[in-house]
């Protein structure tokens, strides 16, 4: 037997004796027997992964420390959308580095997510107040993709009858790059200048532009209004604390990055973008929206609102494929605003603006030409032929400035900038700054009349802030409390050793456009990761740029699109997608300019190979791609996977392999060997990046050799087709995956996959006598997850799948995935990290719930008044003076057998009213004046 270093044993939940007991329960002599039964022999990898041998936690941290020590951290004045920040330690320690925050899942289950939902609600309130627009989503991926998403909203608003987009000012180059990538397959015409015509869907107004200048856009905005075009403002949220809100001057939408609200640059990410819209655009805004509703007892409660507009419902008709966003970073930004309050934010903004104004004045006095008269934090200077020399001198002094071209440099100030920086930078131009606090921003009209809500005024001491964050997170159930058995989500351990490097100075505080020679640590770390992921998947090339799984899908499909175009077959636009696919699949295909044709599935859950063959042959002249999830979304290894790929290839298409379920394959099989041409990997699932309560995520893609030339490029690297603002996307959290692979090694990764499959089959075995297990493969085995059919409780007792999900909260669990991919069922994925004790506790709870349903069926409890129909039960409900239910208080909150009373989780609210919340949408907190 392979001897595993301590980390492998720490990561995998079941002990050796547990593994033996679970295999015995399945009637199996060994793990190898289980894997032979579950995984088709035709796809098995018959060799060990060629990865570096596993290291201990201490050794891996030391090795990564040496690598990242090659980075040279200098003070950045590059700007271009990325700024130095002071992350308040109270936020870093109590939120960013707190597993109670970062291990939580997207808050679909409202009752166990009230803390992070509340903070995201404050984020939306912050954005609405800054922009003057009434509706904001709970974050997007980055500023560049947010601009593209806003353009998509504008086109949808015009029912796709207008296709021209006018960029009315100079956006950051990376934003233009991403917009151009998005435009090509969707047929958007991207124009610059000030000419608004009848085909213009929207104008995009940078506020300020990439040079730091606030232009005069009054006429083009008036023309847009006259022509019915929407106005999109790309606005700096720190500047908006001292400037007129975009809605005041005509913006219908506003977007930007919240990075400078306490989130480190991280060599490009992750950061939360914002998007706010007018009320008329509410129902086509992309991303999550947190709304306020009430629970069953009339208490205020938060929930995700208007979900029917999202990709998992509307599929290829959705406005966007956005799924995972940047919830953790949005919560950091909200906490930053709560910590500083409006006066503190204005003080930061005014100081930054004053430094920039004094720098501009000094340069002017020295005879240096600068761009524009109105500016906030950035000064762009004309230095004919001297840009490189001046930047080099700044570099020698430990400061980085932006080289725009051979004759132009930019200097951007932020909250970390000092008087010493100002003097040193001015001296590079032969200038000397003078005193003063004048600022040069236009329309300096915003006073104290914003962020008047109490939450932005109540937490000035660290004691108050620490307790505020604790009160919020105590409302939630995350992996630090209990198992989160969500099918297709892979909620595995996010080990402390993996997380620690994210906060290192050499990881967190580099600008993504820093000189290449100063980021050699990142170059080595990302190169390692690309090579390891290639080995794990079998592909020839990897791009780490996509900053979510949905963006990986999009990037992969765009690579296929560009491949066909390069071969003179750009007419290929049909994408075959199984009816069981994730909702992001058809949404991504639509964004990539493809038309979706649905392939049927058989009653046993497998893809109907005859239907696939017929449709592939029917569309052989136009077939672009086939998207398949493997193991299937039903949690089964389909025997015919290689035949599926052959059919697609025989008809001129490419195979897109959705890597959502890669946790069932690592070390056992490789997508490329199976026949895939491209695959995205969810690093926030299989490779241990935490879900953060709804993001960040990372979705790199691996591609076969013929697709390598079509991987996403980046303007900073001299190439095109970027899908994210930064070349390496959410670069700073890639160290998490680096650490995971380095500490597991090839044998450890394979062992983790085997443990995940064992845990899922053990659950299926324990529950199959009570609930039907819907889909199984050969030998009655499942892959790494199983679908439990709770409809038997509906048939016998009227108990719905929602009743079961909410009752599991009383037992201390996050519910499994509900009603997907089959309505009325629960899909359970335990991952390899859960110990047998916790798995048994979940199984005991599910069996006990079936027993409770039987009491309803037998008439012991009424159908409308029983522990399941009334779940979950709060402490206040349980302690009410009157208890009129036919079951006891103990039965409500301390259910026997499966329950550990010492680990009781108390939900803060009872069942939330979802319908009422959508009918009466409240997605930001009204200002204090609204109550007057």
UniProtKB/Swiss-Prot annotation:
Gene3D superfamilies: Aspartate Aminotransferase, domain 1, Type I PLP-dependent aspartate aminotransferase-like (Major domain). Keywords: Oxidoreductase, Pyridoxal phosphate. It catalyses: N(6)-[(R)-lipoyl]-L-lysyl-[glycine-cleavage complex H protein] + glycine + H(+) = N(6)-[(R)-S(8)-aminomethyldihydrolipoyl]-L-lysyl-[glycine-cleavage complex H protein] + CO2. One of its GO terms (biological process) is glycine decarboxylation via glycine cleavage system. InterPro entries: GcvP (IPR003437), GDC-P_C (IPR049316), GDC-P_N (IPR049315), GDC_P (IPR020581), PyrdxlP-dep_Trfase (IPR015424), PyrdxlP-dep_Trfase_major (IPR015421), PyrdxlP-dep_Trfase_small (IPR015422). The modification N6-(pyridoxal phosphate)lysine is found at residue 685. Its EC number is 1.4.4.2. Its cofactor is pyridoxal 5'-phosphate. The keyword Cell membrane does not apply. CDD domains: GDC-P (cd00613). GO terms for cellular component: cytosol; glycine cleavage complex. HAMAP family: GcvP (MF_00711). Belongs to the GcvP family. The glycine cleavage system catalyzes the degradation of glycine. The P protein binds the alpha-amino group of glycine through its pyridoxal phosphate cofactor; CO(2) is released and the remaining methylamine moiety is then transferred to the lipoamide cofactor of the H protein. This is Glycine dehydrogenase (decarboxylating). It comes from Brucella suis (strain ATCC 23445 / NCTC 10510). The gene is gcvP.
